[in-house]
Amino acid sequence: MAKGQSLQDPFLNALRRERVPVSIYLVNGIKLQGQIESFDQFVILLKNTVSQMVYKHAISTVVPSRPVSHHSNNAGGGTSSNYHHGSSAQGTSAQQDSEETE
């Protein structure tokens, strides 16, 4: 299963490391917003005013608020483990919008 995550892990790790605000759309249409605090094979820990554990099987799309360069991680940094933990990040004004439908 490591080959299937060869794009996913560097992308999520770049979002975590750079503390990029993200919108995560779930398969049921709910939109969550915040910063990726950490992730593993099955879940993403999303931090806004509170931390939420979001199961990856429930995620449809992850949309960063700005472009990130995630391919530069292939030359060695921090992808040796399947668990990535971020430092406790500075507070953001990101919020959860569970009622939004478009």
Curated annotation (Swiss-Prot):
Residues 63-102 are annotated as: Disordered. It comes from the Bacteria. Keywords: RNA-binding, Stress response. GO terms for biological process: regulation of DNA-templated transcription; regulation of RNA stability; regulation of translation, ncRNA-mediated. Residues 70-96 have a biased composition (Polar residues). One of its GO terms (cellular component) is cytosol. The keyword GTP-binding does not apply. Gene3D superfamilies: 2.30.30.100. Residues 9-68 form the Sm domain. HAMAP family: Hfq (MF_00436). RNA chaperone that binds small regulatory RNA (sRNAs) and mRNAs to facilitate mRNA translational regulation in response to envelope stress, environmental stress and changes in metabolite concentrations. Also binds with high specificity to tRNAs. Homohexamer. This is RNA-binding protein Hfq. It comes from Citrobacter koseri (strain ATCC BAA-895 / CDC 4225-83 / SGSC4696).
